[in-house]
UniProtKB/Swiss-Prot annotation:
Pathway: One-carbon metabolism; tetrahydrofolate interconversion. It holds the Pfam family FTHFS. Belongs to the formate--tetrahydrofolate ligase family. This is Formate--tetrahydrofolate ligase. It comes from Oenococcus oeni (strain ATCC BAA-331 / PSU-1). One of its GO terms (biological process) is tetrahydrofolate interconversion. One of its GO terms (molecular function) is ATP binding.
Length: 553
């Protein structure tokens, strides 16, 4: 079979204006970035009514290679369109860090891809660069304020705002700023990856440009010497940050290999942020099609939970159905099989791994919406193992199950899934929030630990206790909680797989993200700046004399 990038190069994209016309957008409502991608003028569709149903795609805890959520999402959108309905995919923008690191690209795979995959995976329309620029302008303003006399009496030991870079670079996690007599006060700081920036979270949760500016204004960058918050509004740079982001607020329109419309916008990671695409993009998809199909990062314990508890209240629309993606390989992995033996037949390991799938099914059914299981089939999967999974889902759990082969078969590999998803969205059920908005932060964390992770309780480090006291003192104690933890486990220990019980989640810090509107609880050893592996994906990427890129996947 051809590589992803070879398949991409074999398909001629339609002019992006043609894709716009498919969903009722005139040329004047598009801001082209070349011939195959464009921004949608969000203001031009602001007053349109929503007409679509919302489908959320999430997964079980993934293997390091991922479960193929994006591939399944793309195949599902293509299939719904082939069935005579209109569907738009709403995806996150890939970060270049993982593209050059372990994961590779994030535009689907095989015959279920969005294009142009090189552009989307690399610079795209510049949104992530804009977030980096805005974030680092704010960092520069903070250090300049310290250098110019510190009128706001910022406590240098209580500055939350670090710098960001859209790259995996562990060497920048801890740095010293201001070395040298004329370079400002010396202090310890560091870099995080851009996807973890609060400005990325703000961009993805803002409803329009006015909301964006308002949220930017209330970002808390530090505490002063009396323990009071210092905000962007105090530093008088909300307007400057908004100016950098004024085009980035508009969502990006591209197409699949099958010429289905996709809106790709925003890219926060689900393990260190809320892990969803933008409210603006999802809202646009709901206005322009019968079905808006979106995904949330990593497993349902991370992106799925945060979509329901953080994004849904802002979007004002809950999913009409949830698709949980699983693979035979991941179930073997959670059943105790080593990574280099996942292709070996092992029915017992699959049976043991069903506990992990079951935990994710229980987590999503807490919200009351219909759940469909999509098994992303690999060529070497054994049918006995697949039948075991099917029997568990349909027999024991009484849920819909379908095999997906979009990677090899394109839209045809998702037609049966599409039929079941469409049927599921007709099954109207009340949405049940996991917790009440006015619950305490402690109660929210305990609820997530018990009902989503399947754990027993949580404990706070001394630093976390101090952080929580500051959060409550400043009146932020009722905000939603985003737990930052490993995606590889239901616990905060990446080495513990399957579906353990009786465990404790260890919260080491609380970080207020007041512009975004939530509090981040840092659990375990999760890092805000990833590192590269021994053999990063960057080693496989090349460009020929004609400018054609190879090695992206």
């Amino acid at each position: 079979m051809k590589s992803d990038i070879e398949i991409d190069h074999s398909i001629k994209a339609l002019p992006i204006t043609e894709i716009g016309k498919q969903i009722g957008l005139s040329d004047s409502q598009l801001i082209p970035y070349g011939h195959d991608k464009a921004k949608i003028d969000a203001y031009s569709i602001a007053n349109m009514p929503r007409q679509g149903k919302l489908v959320l795609v999430t997964s079980i805890n993934p293997t390091p290679a991922g479960e193929g959520k994006t591939t399944v999402t793309i195949g599902l959108v293509d299939a719904i369109n082939r069935l005579g309905k209109s569907a738009i995919g709403a995806l996150r923008e890939p970060s270049m860090g993982p593209v050059f690191g372990l994961k590779g690209g994030a535009t689907g795979g095989g015959y279920a891809q969005v294009i142009p995959m090189e552009d989307i995976n690399l610079h795209f329309t510049g949104d992530i660069h804009a977030v980096s620029a805005a974030h680092n302008l704010l960092a520069a303003v903070i250090d300049n304020h310290l250098h110019q006399g510190n009128e706001l009496k910022i406590d240098p030991e209580n500055i939350y705002w670090r710098r960001v870079l859209d790259m995996n670079d562990r060497a920048l996690r801890q740095i010293t700023l201001g070395k040298g007599r004329v370079n400002g006060p010396e202090r310890n700081s560091g870099f995080d990856i851009t996807a973890s920036s609060e400005i990325m979270a703000v961009l993805t949760l803002s409803k329009n440009l006015f909301d964006l500016k308002k949220r930017l204004s209330r970002i808390v960058v530090a505490l002063d010497v009396q323990g009071k918050p210092v905000t962007v509004a105090d530093l008088k740079v909300a307007g400057a940050l908004t100016a950098i982001l004024k085009d980035a607020i508009n969502p990006n329109l591209v197409q699949s290999l099958e010429h289905s419309p996709f809106i790709i916008h925003g890219g926060p990671f689900a393990n260190i942020a809320q892990g969803t695409n933008s409210v603006v993009a999802t809202d646009a998809a709901l206005k322009l099609a019968d079905f808006a199909v979106t995904e949330a990062g990593f497993g349902s314990d991370l992106g799925g939970e945060k979509f329901m508890d953080v994004k849904v209240p802002v979007l004002g629309k809950e999913p009409d159905a949830v698709v949980i993606v699983a693979t035979v390989k991941a179930l073997k992995f959670h059943g105790g099989v080593a990574l280099d033996h996942l292709s070996d037949k092992n029915v017992d390991a699959v049976r043991n791994g069903l506990d992990n799938l079951n935990r994710h099914l229980e987590a999503m059914t807490h919200y009351g919406k219909p759940v469909v299981v999509a098994l992303n089939k690999f060529l070497d999967d054994d049918m006995e193992e697949i039948q075991l999974i099917k029997n568990f889902v349909e027999g024991e759990k009484k849920l819909q199950f379908e095999i997906v082969t979009s990677f090899v078969d394109g839209f045809e590999g998702s037609l049966d899934l599409a039929k079941k998803v469409i049927e599921a969205t007709d099954n109207q059920r009340f949405f049940m929030p996991l917790y009440q908005a006015d619950d305490s932060i402690e109660n929210k964390i305990q609820t997530i630990v018990e009902k989503i992770y399947g754990g027993k309780d949580f404990e706070l480090s001394d630093r976390a206790k101090k952080d929580l006291a500051e959060v409550k003192e400043n009146g932020w104690g009722k905000l939603p909680v985003v737990i930052a933890k490993t995606p590889n486990s239901l616990t905060d220990d990446s080495k513990i797989h399957g579906a353990p019980t009786g465990f404790t989640i260890h919260i080491r810090r609380f970080i207020p993200k007041i512009g975004a509107g939530f509090i981040v609880a840092m659990a375990g050893k999760v890092l805000m700046m990833p590192g590269l592996g021994k053999n990063p994906a960057a080693e496989k990427i090349d460009v020929d004399e004609n400018g054609k890129i190879s090695g992206l996947s």
